[in-house]
Amino acid sequence: MSKRAFPSFHEQKVGIIQSIIYREPFWLLVAVMLLNQTPGKSARPIFWKLKERYPDPDSLAAADQGDVETMIHTLGLQTQRSRRMIKLAQSWAAMPPQKGVLHRTKNYPQRRDGLNIGERIEGDAVDCTGALEIGHLPGCGPYAWDSWRIFCRDILRGVADDYNGLNAKQGFEPEWKRVLPQDKELRACLGWMWLREGWLWNPGTGKRRRAS
């Protein structure tokens, strides 16, 4: 269980950085790249400085790797992370995610998912087993894919105006309700979101029961 202190049930946002920047999906992916294997209290200040220095994908795509390394060196793995962030920005600038275009994500969300489909799939679909709109972007893995699905996918697909079904059609189920993340903070986040709806949720199985 995450040690993060989650907000009360009266709050509308969970407090993790993904819930703050979900309307800027490129930066959500950069943030999770920095957060991977790094405490949020260390990564967050550097993330905001990086975003201020390089305000859009094009500027980060053209950044000098050495400059990026210098900005993030206190987090460790600065060479690998800076290279990945720049490649991510270049790929995003060249081919940003599009509604109705999914790219293969091998072994996601479960082992062997995506092994028997093509690299690119045309057509919008609720089911994203083995393929996602961001599956072509380098440097992304299950943590980034889970974060994208929870906070960004419904908006890109045009089925809701936020990650919790704002202005969606009656009977709509938000994407986050179908995600089973491995990351402890994402699990705690979803546990909190389910509990706000009156459910105790098992992060390993996805099963739930009414909270007493």
Task: Tell me what each language-model feature is.
Residues 1-117, 197-212:
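N-terminal polyanion-binding entry modules of DNA glycosylases/AP lyases
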Residues 1-23, 101-138, 142-212:
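C-terminal accessory module of base-excision DNA glycosylases/AP lyases that mediates lesion recognition
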